[in-house]
Regions:
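N-terminal Rossmann-like NAD(P) cofactor-binding subdomain of oxidoreductases
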Residues: 2-201, 206-208, 294-295, 330-332
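Conserved active-site and cofactor/substrate-binding residues in soluble primary-metabolism enzymes
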Residues: 12, 130, 158-162, 210-218, ...
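Short, solvent-exposed beta-strand edge segments and adjacent coil->beta transition regions
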Residues: 147, 239-243, 298-300
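C-terminal substrate-binding/catalytic lobe of Rossmann-fold NAD(P)-dependent dehydrogenases
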Residues: 197, 211-272
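C-terminal active-site/capping subdomain that shapes the small-molecule cofactor and substrate pocket
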Residues: 245-333
Length: 333
């Protein structure tokens, strides 16, 4: 059994990790941690999330330092603020703990771009170079298994990259025209902390972070091309629906596009649909559903994920499964 801890367990992604790990036959959940000033410390996780009652009743412990984790875990999920992950990851890696980081602290390799996106300077450049960015369907498993620092993609980047990578890697897009990504996320993507804009009577459908969202440089770096990314907040609980417009090279055929997407034929958590996917088909599930339509030299791709699962906790466990050589769907389906 692999001993696993979760930091940031009281958040939405953290709670989903607790649920998945508790049902995983090869993982033992050894510790749940929150910040020292959290109002949730000392409570059982099941007091916050009734779905965990009887499944995971562990107490949320205040995290005093890396040693709390090192003493009890082979691997840790950091479902934390970016700065928290940035600060604690080096000590964990040095102690031999496998770090699966759900924050953005190690996603962007250019430190100048990182600082502009996240608002603080990256102080661990050596570890940043060693970090493996683990989009599950594309990660180099050998490289993954040779590091202790695993950076997990963001929710929007997961939906966007899974939709576009087959076309880009097969050279089918005319990249003189930037792909345009318009993605709508449920309110859970904004986190559990109460905010006026996320309250029941205030939440609406609106664009935000136009040209400034920190996921834009992440998407661009790992696709290898610039994109136009416009995120939206939707008036629903969970899920992401991304609609992507792109230009195909002259002469690209439907058969070439279909062959490109056949890459996912042996990827159990990506489903390529004949029509356009529906958000309801992936909510509370670990899948990414993709559909597309072509006309002239243009293609519209739609990609749907559950932002808390394929966009966060389920992908994190999927990558852990790959890291330890388990079936990648272990504990997920």
């Amino acid at each position: 059994m692999v001993k696993v801890a979760v930091v940031g367990a009281s958040g939405y992604a953290g709670s989903q990790l607790c649920r998945i790990i508790s049902r995983h036959e090869k993982l033992e959940l050894t510790g749940l941690f929150v910040s020292e000033n959290s109002l949730d410390k000392g409570k059982k996780i099941s007091e916050l999330y009734g779905e965990l009652n009887g499944l995971c009743d562990k107490v949320l412990q205040p995290l005093t330092g890396a040693k709390d984790i090192i003493d009890i875990a082979d691997a840790v999920f950091l479902a934390t603020d970016h700065k928290v992950s940035h600060d604690i990851a080096p000590a964990l890696v040095d102690a031999g703990v496998a770090v699966f980081d759900l924050s953005g602290a190690f996603r962007i390799s250019n430190t100048d771009v990182f600082e502009k996106a996240y608002g603080f300077a990256h102080e661990h450049k050596d570890l940043l170079k060693k970090a493996v960015y683990a989009l599950a369907e594309y990660v180099d498993v050998k490289a993954l298994q040779n590091t202790k620092m695993i950076s997990l993609p963001g929710c929007y980047p997961t939906a966007s990259q899974l939709a576009l990578k087959p076309l880009i890697e097969n050279g089918l897009l005319d990249l003189n025209y930037r792909p345009s990504i318009n993605a709508v996320s449920g309110v859970s993507g904004a986190g559990r902390k109460a905010k006026l804009t996320n309250s029941f009577c205030e939440v609406s459908l609106n664009a935000y972070g136009v040209f400034t969202h920190r996921h834009q440089p992440e998407i661009a770096e790992h696709l290898g091309t610039e994109v136009i990314f416009t995120p939206h907040l939707g008036d629903f609980k969970r899920g992401i629906h991304a609609t992507i417009n792109a230009k195909l090279k002259d002469g690209v055929t439907p058969e070439q596009v279909a062959k490109a997407y056949s890459y996912y034929d042996n990827k159990p958590l990506v489903r390529v649909k004949k029509g356009m996917p529906k958000l309801q088909d992936v909510q509370y599930l670990p899948f990414c559903d993709i559909g597309y339509a072509m006309k002239d030299n243009y293609i519209v791709i739609c990609s749907c994920i559950d932002n808390l699962l394929k966009g966060a906790s389920a992908q994190a466990v999927q990558v852990l499964n790959l890291y330890y050589g388990f079936d990648e769907t272990q504990g997920l389906i």
